[in-house]
């Protein structure tokens, strides 16, 4: 930085020229220093206005931060001073003005990818400098990127910037420009440096497309789109550009690409070539140099786009305290030491670090769980005191990572996990006026469990029940909460959702391991575990039911101390520890972009496999060994106080001779057709009709002679059996509605080549080992 003595310390030492921009609290003028004869921009901030509106701390904070900065990509603050009426900031003059105005009024087109990459590189270099000093800008937008006389990018407007005590510190302030603000900031969640990364993604999209990714006619609708992270990617952009934008605009801040990774991304490698910062204008040389402007600060420049670039200012939840007089805080810049704690902004003391979901999942105990994690949370012991004495939920935020989309209906609610990972609860009440159940309350929870939206759709009437949740809606900002400030009247809804997610996790395999004795599956809960032994025995471990051991005949071994049960339990303990160790190792190996789960380790020993099950690892994946599907998961019964699983009892008539013959023979396909846009329909020799849908799910219709009912297998392998009188979930009902049409097509299909031999076998029964319910892929 040039010495402050080069610049005047009073306004009389400057020749103030024409107005560059004007806002509610400040005006920016072009000026010339009478000492150095250098052109500068002077921001004149009205002290009466900022003191009357509580912005004194904002100005003090801006000066505290900006005065320490020196980087080619950051607009320089030369000096500052004050008189009775104004605070003056003497700034570097950016001759070519705002990048947004330049693109709209002079370039008259979006930037090319080469030009966009040059701009991106300079912005990222400047942000890396800021982040290295734990400074979060919080308002990166094209309006706050200025162009110097040499067409270099200058990051300006530090009115919303904040100094963090450490890189992982989080803040709760709602601020920024709507088109560039991140989802966690809109949702009033704790946020940190990744919020600037999101803004960089919006910036890059705007440079290459010509408009922001979430732009709408109104601020509220824009913020709704931001929260849902919904935007259209133009097809004309290169693969590298699309990939980088997608990585920058990840909804979860923990999944976003880092600024260091941006510099190594193929988009910059391809279009710029090299990773070092360069001050050469490069692709910007063709730009004309016809605008004059300066740091906008708190100024909002008047333009035709002012409606769309309206900024959200000062919605800080911690700004209720009285601020010291500004005169006491404006010290010479030489006294503003970077590490000087006494000169840090006052608001820092109110920042709070909130642990991420990953922090709360560390150090899991690799032992059998001994407590019920799904116990009701209804007493005072279910809450813990916060630092200010208010009570909070004891349970950690829910998380739906890797859970497949699903939808379940209970008496009072419909619960869904969407493809985005969002959890939706639709609470149902019977409306006499409509003579039907209607959706009266909706609770939407983000995949990390930290953003909650609760509202009443169409109050007084409700919505009719549909096959899928209602479209996302945020009626007002009062409907949006975060995990830390959720009112206690909504805690039961959150607990209800968390139990639903917990139950789905308890049925979703994370690690599948084939040991020497059986197939082991560690579920996403990291506590639920099962072993299906090749002998037919089974061991189940859950946080609700403890350990259950079944012998090869399916009977429960009530005495876990007997030799048979002890051997099975010992092997289960050994495999459980092994699976937990595998999980911990893979957790360290995976990256934000690439997950290692779910994973399958090993395969069933060939000596224990039925001859019909052996296969070459390179065989066609459609060459299955089929059997009559059976249920391995009961229908789900929820209540606010308890969650349990119940099995539908089906009466199997095992006395008929034909059923004995069927049980003695392998269940093989006799007909198979492929239906476009649906999947593969197969009829098995035992009479079962299976439909393998292209989304990975499967429906099996079982004939009455074998007990009847339907088995639905989700894409993740989770199977549920439904009796003839059971209430079917929407996903199953939708698929079952297609069955009559598919069965008609199947009737017209010719028999497969092995069908005749199957019929001959059925004429002459033989004693063979029953083929267990197993599918080899």
From Swiss-Prot:
Residues 508-611 form the Cryptic POLO box 2 (CPB2) domain. Keywords: ATP-binding, Cytoplasm, Cytoskeleton, Kinase, Nucleotide-binding, Serine/threonine-protein kinase, Transferase, Ubl conjugation. It catalyses: L-seryl-[protein] + ATP = O-phospho-L-seryl-[protein] + ADP + H(+); L-threonyl-[protein] + ATP = O-phospho-L-threonyl-[protein] + ADP + H(+). GO terms for cellular component: centriole; cytoplasm; nucleus. Residues 371-381 have a biased composition (Polar residues). InterPro entries: Kinase-like_dom_sf, Plk4-like_POLO_box_2_sf, POLO_box_dom, POLO_box_Plk4_1, POLO_box_Plk4_2, POLO_box_Plk4_C, Prot_kinase_dom, Protein_kinase_ATP_BS. Residues 390-507 form the Cryptic POLO box 1 (CPB1) domain. The keyword ATP-binding applies. It is found in: Cytoplasm, Cytoskeleton, Microtubule organizing center, Centrosome, Centriole. Its EC number is 2.7.11.21. Belongs to the protein kinase superfamily. Ser/Thr protein kinase family. CDC5/Polo subfamily. PANTHER family: SERINE/THREONINE-PROTEIN KINASE PLK (PTHR24345), SERINE_THREONINE-PROTEIN KINASE PLK4 (PTHR24345:SF91). This is Serine/threonine-protein kinase PLK4. It comes from Drosophila pseudoobscura pseudoobscura. The lineage of its organism: Eukaryota, Metazoa, Ecdysozoa, Arthropoda, Hexapoda.
């Amino acid at each position: 930085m040039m010495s402050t003595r080069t610049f005047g310390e009073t306004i009389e030492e400057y020749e103030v020229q024409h107005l560059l921009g004007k806002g509610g609290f400040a005006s920016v003028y072009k000026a010339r220093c009478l000492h150095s004869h250098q052109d500068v921009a002077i921001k004149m901030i009205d002290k009466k206005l900022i003191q009357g509106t509580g912005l004194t701390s904002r100005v003090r904070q801006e000066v505290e931060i900006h005065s320490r900065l020196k980087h080619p990509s950051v607009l320089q603050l030369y000096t500052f001073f004050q008189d009775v009426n104004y605070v003056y900031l003497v700034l570097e003059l950016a001759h070519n003005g705002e990048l947004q105005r330049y693109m709209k009024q002079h370039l008259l087109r979006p930037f090319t990818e080469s030009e966009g990459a040059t701009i991106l590189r300079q912005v990222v270099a400047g942000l890396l400098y800021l982040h290295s000093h734990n400074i979060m800008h919080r308002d990166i937008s094209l309006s706050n990127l200025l162009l110097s006389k040499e067409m270099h990018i200058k990051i300006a407007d530090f009115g919303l910037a904040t100094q963090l005590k450490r890189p992982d510190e989080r803040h709760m302030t709602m601020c920024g420009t709507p088109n560039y603000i991140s989802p966690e900031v809109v949702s009033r969640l704790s946020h940190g440096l990744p919020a600037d990364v999101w803004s960089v993604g919006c910036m890059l999209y705007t440079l290459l497309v010509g408009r922001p990714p979430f732009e709408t006619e109104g601020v509220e609708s824009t913020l709704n789109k931001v929260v849902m992270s919904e935007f259209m990617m133009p097809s004309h952009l290169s693969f590298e550009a699309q990939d980088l934008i997608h990585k920058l605009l990840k909804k979860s801040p923990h999944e976003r690409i880092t600024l260091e990774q941006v510099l190594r991304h193929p988009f910059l490698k391809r279009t710029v070539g090299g990773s070092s910062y360069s001050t050469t204008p490069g692709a910007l040389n063709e730009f004309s140099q016809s605008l004059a402007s300066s740091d906008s600060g708190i100024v909002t420049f008047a333009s035709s786009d002012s409606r769309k670039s309206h900024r959200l200012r000062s919605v800080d939840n911690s700004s209720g305290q009285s601020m010291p007089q500004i005169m006491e805080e404006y010290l010479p810049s030489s006294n503003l030491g970077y590490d000087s704690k006494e000169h840090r902004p006052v608001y820092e003391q109110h920042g709070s670090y909130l642990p991420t979901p990953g922090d709360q999942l560390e150090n899991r105990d690799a032992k059998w769980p001994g407590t019920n994690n799904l116990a009701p949370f209804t007493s005072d012991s279910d809450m813990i005191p916060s630092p200010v004495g208010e009570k909070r939920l004891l349970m950690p935020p829910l998380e739906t990572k890797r859970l497949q989309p699903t939808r379940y209906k209970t008496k009072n609610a419909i619960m869904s996990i969407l493809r985005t990972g969002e959890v939706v609860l639709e609470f149902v009440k019977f409306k006499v006026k409509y003579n039907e159940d209607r959706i009266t309350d909706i609770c939407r929870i983000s995949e990390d469990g930290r953003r909650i939206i609760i509202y009443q759709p169409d109050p007084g009437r409700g919505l009719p029940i549909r096959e899928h949740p209602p479209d996302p809606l945020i009626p007002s900002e009062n409907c949006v909460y975060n995990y830390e400030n959720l009112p206690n009247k909504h805690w039961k809804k959150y607990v209800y959702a968390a139990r639903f997610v917990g139950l789905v996790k308890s049925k979703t395999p994370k690690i599948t391991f084939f040991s020497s004795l059986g197939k082991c599956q560690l579920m996403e809960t990291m506590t639920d575990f099962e072993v299906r032994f090749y002998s037919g025995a089974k061991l189940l471990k859950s946080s609700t039911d403890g350990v259950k051991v079944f012998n090869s005949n399916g009977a429960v071994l009530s005495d876990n101390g007997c030799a048979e049960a002890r051997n099975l339990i010992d092997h289960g303990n050994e495999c459980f520890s092994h699976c937990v160790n595998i999980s911990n190792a893979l957790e360290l190996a995976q990256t934000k972009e690439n997950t290692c789960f779910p994973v399958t380790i090993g395969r069933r020993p060939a000596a224990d496999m039925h001859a019909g099950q052996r296969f070459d690892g390179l065989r066609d994946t459609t060459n299955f060994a089929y059997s009559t599907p059976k249920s391995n998961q009961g229908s789900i019964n929820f209540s606010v106080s308890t969650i349990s699983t119940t099995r539908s009892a089906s009466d199997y008539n095992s006395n008929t001779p034909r059923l004995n013959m069927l049980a003695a023979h392998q269940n093989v396909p006799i007909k198979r057709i492929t239906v476009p846009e649906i999947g593969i329909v197969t009829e098995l020799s035992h009479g079962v009709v299976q439909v393998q849908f292209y989304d990975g799910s499967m429906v099996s219709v079982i004939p009455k002679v074998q007990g009847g009912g339907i088995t639905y297998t989700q894409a993740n392998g989770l199977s549920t059996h439904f009796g003839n009188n059971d209430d079917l979930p929407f996903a199953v009902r939708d698929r079952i509605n297609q069955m009559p049409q598919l069965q008609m097509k199947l009737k017209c299909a010719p028999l497969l080549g092995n069908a005749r031999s199957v019929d001959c076998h059925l004429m002459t029964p033989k004693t063979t080992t029953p083929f267990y319910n197993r599918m080899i892929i």
